[in-house]
Amino acid sequence: MMDPIHQFNIEPIFTIGHIGGQEIAFTNSSAYMFLAVALTSLLMLGTGRRLVPGRMQSIAEISYEFVADTIRTTAGKEGMKFFPFVFSIFMLVTVSNLVGIIPYTFTISSHIIVTAALAFLVFFTVLIYGFYKNGLRFFKLFVPSGIPVVILPLVVTIEVISFLSRPVSHSVRLFANMLAGHITLKVFASFVTMLGAMGIVGVFGAVLPLALVVALTALELLVAFLQAYVFTILTCIYINDAIHPGH
């Protein structure tokens, strides 16, 4: 059976240069990041503005309205100033997840360094804007209203720890789900290949694993969208905390 972890290896494509004796290379991960951005740009810029939209234009409009409605629901109208930021994250995660389902491709969201970079980008955006807009009133985020003074120090400590751990939970959730899903797919696909190589008996034995691979692929399609949605809605919730820290 082929190593199910091999699909996550980062391989250099060509060397860009050296900094401090360290090789700086353009990798397969970098290539698929560029691909995700290129596909998103093609979808959003390559579609027309026809009165009767085609398939690509419909997908672009649905994506736009979906993210816009999510922001309005969680962060209000004021949160719409973050629409370009949130929409970019949503499309990057969605497209990279979908591309990763295609056999022999690379899933950038299955690497913790990528999801952590996105999570910390959200975290510092919220932190900087929260202090920029509210000043010291941003600390109200850590003091829930109606809390008795006796337990206030404990609650504040818990809230601060919870806030600081956001990038960890935000990134690990996406990374772990994509990693586990792709490993499972690889394992069952390997079973199909091995049984099929055993001849007529193996072909019949491969029917069940093949059916499971098809079912798991369909499930991974759902997970690809679901994880992008979860990552996006958490981003919107955190942005709402920066806009309305006292709520």
UniProtKB/Swiss-Prot annotation:
Pfam families: ATP-synt_A
Protein keywords: ATP synthesis, Cell inner membrane, Cell membrane, CF(0), Hydrogen ion transport, Ion transport, Membrane, Transmembrane, Transmembrane helix, Transport
Subcellular location: Cell inner membrane
Domain of life per record: Bacteria
GO cellular component terms attached to this protein's record: plasma membrane; proton-transporting ATP synthase complex
Keyword Nucleotidyltransferase: no
One Gene Ontology molecular-function label: proton-transporting ATP synthase activity, rotational mechanism
Chief location of this protein within or outside the cell: membrane
Membrane-topology annotation of the record: Multi-pass membrane protein
Residues that span the membrane, as ranges: 24-44, 82-102, 112-132, 141-161, 194-214, 219-239
Transmembrane listed as a keyword: yes
Subunit architecture: F-type ATPases have 2 components, CF(1) - the catalytic core - and CF(0) - the membrane proton channel. CF(1) has five subunits: alpha(3), beta(3), gamma(1), delta(1), epsilon(1). CF(0) has three main subunits: a(1), b(2) and c(9-12). The alpha and beta chains form an alternating ring which encloses part of the gamma chain. CF(1) is attached to CF(0) by a central stalk formed by the gamma and epsilon chains, while a peripheral stalk is formed by the delta and b chains.
Family statement: Belongs to the ATPase A chain family.
Functional summary from the UniProt entry: Key component of the proton channel; it plays a direct role in the translocation of protons across the membrane.
Protein name: ATP synthase subunit a
Taxonomic classification: Bacteria, Pseudomonadati, Pseudomonadota, Alphaproteobacteria, Hyphomicrobiales
